[in-house]
A protein has these predicted regions:
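N-terminal targeting and processing segments of secreted/endomembrane and organelle-targeted proteins
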Residues: 2-4, 20-21, 32-35
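Bacterial N-terminal signal peptides that target proteins for export
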Residues: 4-19
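Bacterial N-terminal signal peptides
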Residues: 18-28
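Flexible loop/hinge segments at secondary-structure junctions
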Residues: 32-375
Length: 375
């Protein structure tokens, strides 16, 4: 080959190599920046909502992270109302709520939202009576009158009628309730609306009812704290919070007329009563169930997700995490005072998880839920 041709090719090759290096340089830095964001391919999920499920959700997040080190899940325990609000605003990938979203809420959401039941829990009455050792019992009528402000002392005749062999203290009774938007409140007021016509008419049900009386506490944690540090109080919390704080739990008279303690069997029995009546969208209330051994203030906890996920890595990780929660994750329920899903509900929840869809390619696993674009 003539020398000038070799020289021309040499110079051309050098220019091409320089141009190629300049062309790929931004891409190389972009790749490094993306790698730093996702920490070598890490997928980040952001969730928020129910304080009811928080002890179990934190356990799930920890255990799933051990199984899938590339997945980071952050769950903020801000109350079901807050979780639903953030999900509708698309600032989180999933919400969690102790009750199903209302039809109005679903219609106002910017996309189709799926309800995926992941666990069962109990709302309990707990109290602080210094020096009092007996376990108390409450009928539905008595509970309604306490929270309506009609019963103001612990030795009221209605409480005495529910506890005939107990010497009740002659002390003022103080109610503690949630101050934030709360699925726990929604479950409790749903129950009260079923058992008390006066409650249904005067107050009704919801995440933020207009309480007739009482002190407010933020989250299950706040209500538990108020009761623990304030003598002669009574309030409602998720079972795990009462047990963890060594607070007494009352027996509640159920629809069949039996006084029932919340536990694995009685909460599961409440769910079993409602399986056949559960609609296709899985939004169901299981309070005041009819079974003789059913605890009357029980509820599913739902994880709420958009059916259409814009980022495939987020969509796939959501499906993997939720599938694990309703299967292997159920073994962590009982030690934390929750009840596992009935087998039939596991099957139906799996069907909902399978409906989550996402594109085949694209995304980096750090999607901004609000915009649908990658960070």
């Amino acid at each position: 080959m003539p020398r000038f041709i070799r020289h021309h090719l040499y110079k051309t090759g050098r220019r091409f190599a320089a141009m190629f290096f300049i062309a790929i340089l931004p891409l190389s830095f972009a790749g490094c920046f993306s790698g730093r964001q996702s920490r070598g391919g890490q997928v980040k999920l952001q969730g928020a909502g129910s304080t009811f499920i928080n002890p179990l959700m934190q356990k799930w997040v920890h255990e799933f992270g051990n199984l899938e080190p590339s997945v980071k899940i952050d769950y903020q325990s801000i109350g079901s109302g807050g979780g639903i609000k953030q999900l509708k605003e698309k600032t989180v990938h999933f919400g969690a709520s102790d009750t199903a979203m209302s039809t109005e809420d679903l219609r106002s959401a910017p996309g189709e939202i799926l309800h995926i039941p992941v666990i069962l829990g109990a709302v309990v009455l707990t109290y602080n009576l210094p020096g009092f050792e007996s376990r108390l019992r409450f009928s539905p009528e008595t509970i309604a009158d306490i929270f309506l402000g009609k019963i103001t002392r612990w030795n009221d005749q209605k409480i005495a009628a529910d506890n005939p062999s107990v010497a009740l203290p002659d002390e003022p009774l103080t109610v503690v309730h949630r101050s934030d938007g709360s699925g726990t409140s929604a479950v409790f007021t749903n129950y009260l609306s079923k058992v008390s016509e006066e409650w249904k008419t005067r107050v009704g049900e919801g995440t933020s009812p207009n309480w007739p009386i009482g002190l407010g506490g933020k989250g299950n944690e706040g209500v538990t704290g108020q009761i623990k540090q304030t003598p002669n109080t009574i309030g409602y919390v998720e079972l795990a919070y009462a047990m963890k704080n060594k607070l007494p739990v009352a027996e509640i008279k159920n629809k069949a007329g039996n006084f029932i303690l919340p536990n694995f069997n009685t909460v599961t029995n409440a769910a079993a009563e409602a399986i056949s009546e559960t609609p296709d969208d899985l939004r169901v209330s299981i309070t005041n169930a009819a079974g003789p051994n059913a605890y009357p203030i029980a509820s599913y906890v739902y994880v709420l997700v958009y059916r259409e996920q814009p980022d495939p890595r987020i969509g796939k990780t959501l499906k993997d995490f939720l599938t694990w929660c309703i299967n292997d994750g159920q073994k962590h329920a009982q030690p934390l005072y929750y009840s596992p899903l009935p087998a039939e509900m596991v099957k139906r929840a799996a069907g909902k998880i399978a409906m989550i869809s996402y594109p085949e390619t694209g995304g980096n696993g750090n999607i901004n839920p609000a915009s649908g674009t990658n960070n």
